[in-house]
């Protein structure tokens, strides 16, 4: 999706309190813009330009920030970000390229505004209420959640920690409402800042057992996720189908010691339980034969 697109003071505005300029105000780039993490813009025209620039640089879909978040210090979770016409500007520009817009947002007001503007995927959504979940279901948009729990809290500041706890308090209710209204669910990790956390990402799958059957979990993290990504149409960077095992599909395959349909916990320890790992047709791990595996096709 390229750089996240944020309003001034939004979740993607990671300027320090002493930084006053960014490209959206006609100033020099803020550091967060220089490194390609964010585009800080205000107004439909600026949002359109930022969206088109991301697409020019190869984005397969577009991500806007339409509500507060935990990682940022200066935007509370309850705030709503970008006016509807600004969000709609991004949606129109993305649709002209045959793809879609997703938004980072937790609170119901921001979710509802994004849906009304044509957004196709809500990233997070943990603080959603029942009327907004029904609106989401009726729209046919996706909810891409993470099974955030209290033990995931690795934030350094008390402000961030308090916001994370507020988000976790909504996880149960959000999943329950999503099941009640049969919302299209995707799964993600939201792992960032510390590469060491990636070794624990599969624990996010294991935690889903609290709300879903093993079959529902496996379907969500494979074929359902693939359906969401496929909405990028011709912008889709993958050469074959995702999330299926069939001729002509992208060869991303795992061979697991045991049956995840009976025991999803197996996925929480890939080092011991994944016998074969194939990504895009390349064998990266093969415990079933002697010798090096990497690079074999």
Locations of regions flagged by a protein language model:
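Hydrophobic faces of well-ordered beta-strands that scaffold small-molecule active sites
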Residues: 1, 62-64, 101-103, 122-123, ...
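Divalent-metal coordination cores built from histidine and acidic residues
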Residues: 1-75, 82-93, 132-134, 139-158
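C-terminal cap of metal-dependent C-N hydrolases
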Residues: 235-236, 241-294
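N-terminal active-site wall of soluble small-molecule enzyme domains
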Residues: 83-94, 102-115
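Histidine/acidic-residue-rich catalytic or RNA/ligand-binding cores of hydrolases
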Residues: 11-13, 72-74, 111-117, 138, ...
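His/Asp/Glu-enriched, well-ordered alpha-helical/loop segment
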Residues: 96, 169-260
